[in-house]
A protein has these predicted regions:
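Extended acidic/polar, glycine-enriched regions
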Residues: 148-152, 215-300, 627-673
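Active-site-adjacent substrate/metal-binding segments within catalytic domains
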Residues: 66-99, 103-123, 129-132, 190-203, ...
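Extended carbohydrate-recognition surfaces in non-catalytic/accessory domains of CAZymes
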Residues: 20-111, 163-176, 180-183, 534-535, ...
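Substrate-binding/catalytic cleft of secreted carbohydrate-active enzymes
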Residues: 211, 339-342, 349-538, 542, ...
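Beta-strand/loop-rich accessory regions of lumenal/periplasmic or secreted enzymes
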Residues: 114, 159-161, 264, 626-629, ...
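Beta-strand-rich binding/interaction modules
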Residues: 121-123, 209-244, 251, 273-275, ...
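Substrate-binding clefts and catalytic carboxylate motifs of secreted carbohydrate-active enzymes
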Residues: 33-53, 57-59, 63-66, 88, ...
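Accessory beta-strand-rich segments of carbohydrate-active enzymes
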Residues: 22-23, 44-46, 88-197, 219-221, ...
Length: 949
């Protein structure tokens, strides 16, 4: 056996060495590979910053990010091809490079991966070809006869930021994204043998059928093409050799692989195809290797999209190629980061909005597993037909062999030229579906930003519903807010296959002319699930939970839990037994424990997933019973590649809070009265109650004042006008202006009296009210100085925010620590994505769209057992004993433009109702059942325990 193993290893090594010695395509980079290794070229900018002089610039780059020219956001000049005032500087580049003598006699192409926008190229003073127009596409020139071999050569490039072609400007530059200028993707020499394989287009089906069209630059008598299929270990599986027809420019070949490992987003199995062009003596003239995957795409009318015979659900997002410091110029590492970011949210699809991405991004999608919609530019304007024909050919020739690409997109939102629809399949032997985003075409209805109710109507149409943009993000709105309702509707409907959220990340530019300020152009670029540097916002985790392919259906467990969970396997292909599950039984610290008290892990284990096939439900048995002293069970699902899908937390014991142990001689609470106040003292603490309104007016600990006061007060609010929904006020001309403003209900309660009585060792202070919302606030003060507040208020009607509140000066707050859902705040329509655990964060108050500190300190927090707020004056501790109540920590801040909400000040609050949040396009009530206001009728009660330290 050892001899066989050694022989196989030797043969594999020999094959590898032989492949290395084949005449293959070489690359000599003239620029860097991306933003991380730019190469300096000489540069002259004609206008704007640092213009009018020769200097240096890194290539590839967007010149604005290197300190040149003028920043320009595209939508400013929407619909105008040649407007006055548009930034239209040009950049002139020079670069000297050596070409080795060994390249003589070979074909040398000068390749630009992309340049914005019109690009003219000279080598050694001679123009090498026609001006290129179209910013996001690879283009090249055969410069074989322009070069000096073994000597230095001069490359000169002139790039115009604005195109001379009106259709290019309208398609690419009058759009809702940043316009840049420059050679923003790599430049290299592509060196091939004089007789070579020019291009290869592969079609590999799920049944193992492999077809390829091989294009050669020359077809001589006796030439042939040998094709070998290699598995992921480099082992040859099969091969074939076919003759090349003399005088033809392409050759078709076919072979078969038995039982191939199929490519899907869940199983991204890749193969290699090695193509060798042979002369009539069998000598290899040129060899090319392509990665590919076996998979079959099928669109079934009025049914769905099938990959390898399985109907898939699209869990997707739109993605720009972008970073704040480098604009559209990325690197291999940053492209992989983007794919991992999406996979981390359990997404399986991405739309390349609104242009083709870097090749490295597609390679990452191939190897890590994402379904891709590859898009021709055209935001609202469209390319003229000759330009579009040329760009489509280049786009598909570059991208055709990526198994991750499932759809081609002909522009965006009527930015499609219908004369181009037939061009895609001319170059794609796989005949992938062609999409019109926001349109109805090729069996797909892709309408954008429909409300929840409108989406239901679209699903009644015969076409497959797949919105290529939905739940438009803005600051903390959209994305995860409303996603639960949308997704439950979408995944269950027989004619909906999912869709693409807008958008992955904020497009905020780091302005080198504004001391590094991140410029999102107000609300235009602030649409991301994550911030410009991929700072994770609350919706990131909502999406991660809701789109997890493994769903635990239990909502709670108790002490009698037997270890069995109901589970749904929402994978399209994988069995649940390919996943692992880690569990822990834990004990949480109490509110009264030290601030650094940690969670105790009492017991932990791991189980393999049970045998539950894709698209089905079953039982997951983790084979453990709950320990008597356990507070909660953590359960984490791990996918076959070692990535966490989600962690569920199941509390089994809402904590019985311990009070300070006092000796029998401990002093009972005592009180004193004046005309206006009642002061209660217990355990070095003093509490002042007003006799005019019954509210707590002041707290001190050991004569140290804590300005927690003015409560409880009833707070209730609703959106001032329910514009665009069922409450729209047609008689109010300013109704639309009010649909984001929340107005408080005035509480007409009249204070009647303050009662004081002793109850055992405690003192009970009761404030009574009539004729309004607040009915009663009963304070029980025990000898340790704890206050238990039992309150009752009444409300009847529609409400978006409701509960009780207290005041505390925000500028005194340092941090908070709590046991509850976290670490992010929640909205009524974005409850998912948090986990019950101990969390803490320092005070922050980021301005949405401008500063990016997460999780936000302020907002509404769910399922809180206790919360300790550390201040400059001391600690305010709340233990919540009101079922289903939320703790409010001030009110969330909106962006400067107040496009989402203007919420009333709510201080420190205990809330029975919290507001939902809208998205950029749809008003709040249009986002689904979870976004509706609450109808409340009758008394509401609650209990909360306060400790001051």
């Amino acid at each position: 056996m050892k001899k066989v193993t050694t022989l196989l290893s030797t043969l594999a090594l020999a094959t590898t060495l032989a492949a290395q010695n084949l005449p293959q395509t070489e690359r000599q980079y003239l620029s860097g590979h991306g933003c991380d290794d730019m190469v300096e070229w000489d540069f002259f900018c004609t206008d704007g910053r640092n213009s009018g002089k020769w200097t240096k610039i890194g290539v590839p780059s967007c010149w604005e990010l290197q300190g040149f020219g003028t920043y320009q956001y595209g939508i400013t000049f929407y619909g105008k091809p040649f407007p006055k005032g548009v930034a239209d500087e040009k950049g002139m580049y020079k670069y000297e490079f050596e070409v080795p003598e060994k390249f003589r006699g070979k074909q040398v192409n000068l390749v630009f991966e992309a340049s914005m926008t019109d690009t003219e190229v000279k080598v050694n003073g001679r123009k090498v070809g026609s001006k290129h127009q179209g910013a996001f596409y690879r283009f090249s020139y055969n410069v074989t006869d322009f070069l000096k071999y073994g000597k230095k050569n001069l490359l000169e490039v002139t790039v115009a930021k604005e195109s001379e072609n009106a259709s290019v400007n309208l398609a690419e530059r009058r759009a809702d994204y940043w316009n840049f200028g420059g050679i923003f993707r790599p430049v290299f020499l592509e060196v091939k043998p004089a007789v070579n394989l020019r291009h290869i287009a592969i079609d590999a089906k799920m049944d193992g059928t492999f077809r390829a069209n091989c294009y050669t630059n020359i077809s001589n008598d006796g030439m042939s093409i040998r094709t070998q299929i290699l598995d992921k270990k480099g082992k040859k599986i099969t091969e074939t050799t076919v003759p090349v027809k003399a005088g033809g420019d392409w050759t078709s070949l076919q072979l078969n692989v038995s039982n191939p490992a199929l490519w899907t987003a869940e199983t991204p199995n890749l193969y290699k195809a090695q193509f060798s062009l042979l002369d009539k003596a069998g000598k290899v003239l040129h060899s090319e290797t392509e990665n590919f995957g076996f998979r079959t795409i099928e669109v079934r009318e009025s049914d769905g999209l099938y990959i390898n015979g399985v109907r898939i659900n699209v869990r997707g997002v739109n993605r720009h190629s972008f970073r704040p410091e480098s604009g559209r110029t990325l690197s291999k590492e940053k492209n992989i980061e983007d794919v991992l970011l999406m996979k981390g949210m359990n997404m399986n699809s991405v739309r390349l909005s609104h242009y083709p991405a870097d090749p490295e991004f597609l390679e990452a999608c191939d190897s890590l597993g994402l379904y891709v919609m590859d898009e021709l530019g055209g935001w609202h304007g469209k390319y003229d037909t000759p330009t579009g024909v040329r760009l489509i050919e280049g786009m598909i020739e570059r991208d055709v062999n990526h198994p991750s690409i499932i759809w081609w997109s002909n522009g965006n939102e009527k930015g499609w030229n219908t004369e181009l629809d037939g061009e895609f399949h001319k170059y794609d032997p796989q005949k992938r579906p062609v999409i019109h985003p926001q349109g109805n075409f090729s069996g797909f209805e892709t309408m954008h930003y429909r409300s929840y109710g409108e989406s239901q109507n679209y699903m009644r149409l015969p076409e497959i519903f797949m919105p290529t943009e939905f739940l438009h993000g803005l600051y903390d709105g959209g994305h995860g807010a409303g996603l639960y309702d949308y997704w439950e509707m979408m995944r269950k409907h027989p004619r909906c296959i999912g869709g693409f959220l807008w958008v992955l990340a904020d497009e905020g530019v780091k302005r080198v002319d504004m001391d590094g300020f991140i410029d999102n152009q107000g609300n235009f670029g602030a649409d991301g699930i994550v911030g410009p540097h991929h700072e994770k916002e609350g919706s990131y985790y909502t999406i991660k939970q809701l789109w997890s392919p493994v769903q635990i259906m239990n909502t709670s467990i108790d002490k009698q839990f037997d270890g069995k969970f109901s589970v749904e396997n929402r994978y399209d292909y994988l069995n649940l037994n390919t996943c692992r599950f880690l569990w822990k039984q834990v004990k949480f610290p109490l509110a009264t424990d030290a601030s650094n008290a940690a969670i105790q892990v009492l017991k932990e284990g791991e189980v393999q997933g049970s045998d539950v096939v894709a698209h089905s439900a079953g039982i997951l048995d983790i084979k453990t019973n709950i320990l008597p002293n356990a507070d909660a069970l953590f359960l984490t699902a791990i996918d076959p590649y070692g990535h966490e899908l989600w962690r569920w937390t199941f509390p089994v014991n809402k904590l019985n809070q311990q009070t300070e142990q006092l000796s029998p001689l401990s002093s009972r609470p005592a009180y004193t009265e004046t005309e206006n106040e009642l002061t209660v003292k217990a355990n070095k603490r003093a509490f002042i109650f007003s006799k005019k309104d019954g509210q707590l007016k002041g707290v001190s600990v050991d004569n140290r004042k804590i300005n927690f006061a003015n409560g409880p007060r009833f707070i209730g609010a609703r959106r001032a006008d329910r514009s665009l929904d069922q409450f729209y006020n047609h008689d109010d001309e300013k109704a639309k202006e009010k649909d984001r403003t929340y107005s408080e209900f005035p509480d007409a309660a009249v204070f009647t009296k303050l009662d004081v009585k002793e109850d055992g060792g405690n003192l009970v202070v009761t404030a009574n009210y009539k004729l309004g919302n607040l009915d009663k606030a009963q304070w029980t003060i025990n000898p340790s100085g704890e206050l238990a507040l039992d309150y009752t208020y009444n409300f009847s009607g529609v409400v978006d925010l409701m509960g009780i509140r207290f005041d505390y000066p925000e500028d005194q707050v340092i941090s908070k620590r709590w046991l509850g859902a976290g670490p992010y705040r929640v909205w009524q329509n974005r409850i998912h994505g948090t986990q019950y655990d101990v969390w803490e964060n320092d005070y922050n108050d980021p301005i949405p769209g401008e500063t990016f500190t997460y999780p936000e300190f302020k907002g509404y927090f769910g399922d809180v057992s206790w919360m300790n707020i550390q201040t400059k004056e001391g600690t305010i501790s709340l233990t919540n004993e009101t079922p289903d109540a939320y703790i409010g920590v001030y009110q969330p801040r909106d962006g400067r433009d107040r496009l989402l909400y203007t919420l009333p000040e709510s201080g420190i609050s205990v809330l029975n109702v919290i507001p939902p949040v809208r998205n950029k396009v749809n008003s709040t009530d249009l986002c689904g059942p979870s976004s509706q206001p609450k109808w409340v009728n009758g008394p509401q009660t609650g209990r909360v325990i306060f400790r001051f330290m």
